[in-house]
C-alpha cells in the first residue's frame, strides 16, 4: 500500500501512520481482508470494530440455534444424482422456499390449481409436499452460485442448520459457511471508502453478509435523531417478512446498524446500477425477525472492480424513466438538502433516498 503519510509534515505524518497501523492491527483479526489507499493519507475510523456475527442490543430477542427446527431426512450422496435436500418435497427446511410452479403443474395439475387459488386469493398456502426451487447450483468447476431464479425474483433463501440430519455437506449450506473470497477496503477518488474483491466473481457467487448491531425500532429512531444525514447508509431494516403471520410490522421490525460495528461489507458503496445484490438468507424458517443479509454477485465481476449495491434496493428501470425522474428531482427546490449520488452510472437517480426516485 502506498503511504501518502510519508509525504506530509512530520507530526501529522506520525499521527497518520499511528492511526493507519492501529487500523491494520484491527484487520489482522479478519481473515482475507486488506486495506489500500492510493489517494491520500487517511484511514477508516478507529471507532469501527470488526465482528463475525450480529451484536443484539437491549430489547432484541434472537433464536437459540440449538432450538432451530431441522430437517429429518438424511442428505445421502448415494441417493441418485447426489440428491437429498435437493429432493425439495422432502426437505423440511425448504418448506417455505419458492414453489417450483412449472414442476408442480406438470406433476400434479389438481394440486397446482389449488395452489394458484390459494396464492391469488391470499389464503394460507399449504407448502408441505410442494416442489420447491433449490437455491444453489453446484457446477463441477467453480463455486456454488445462487440460481438465476432467486437472483432475479428475490425470494427468501433457506438453508439447513446444525440440527438437521443432512450434515455439513448438504448443498443448501453456503452462506452459513462464511466468506471464501478476499476483500480489499480501498479509498475511492470521490466516494470515500469502497470495497473490491481480489478474486474474479461469477454471477450468483456469494461474497459476504452484512453485520452490525441489531436494534429495536425505537432505538434506531433515537440514534437517527442524533446522527447526521449519512446514518441511513448504514441502517438496514429486517423487514422482509412484514405482513406474514407472526412477523414484525414496519414499526416493530429490527434494524441492523453497521456504522461502528460490522465487517468489510459496511464499506461497500451505493450504485444505481449495482453489480451486487443483497438477499435474505435464513437457517431458521420460523424466525421472521432475524436472518442473514447476504451479498451475491449479480453479474460476472472481474477482480479489483469496485463492488456496489443499491442502498434503496429498487428494481431495475428503463434509462429514459430514470433520466426523467432525475431531471424532475434536480428542478425541485426541496431537494437542496438531499444527499447527491456520485455513482456515475448511466441510470444514476441523482440523489440518495426518496420515494420519488
Residue ranges and their predicted role:
Residues 1-192, 340, 345-357:
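Accessory low-complexity/Zn-finger-associated flanking regions
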Residues 1-28, 209-252, 261-264, 270-357:
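C-terminal SET catalytic tail plus cysteine-rich post-SET Zn-binding segment of SAM-dependent SET-domain
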Residues 111-142, 146-147, 152-158, 162-163, ...:
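Catalytic cores of histone-lysine modification enzymes
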Residues 75, 195, 294-297:
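Short beta-strand element of the conserved SAM-dependent methyltransferase core
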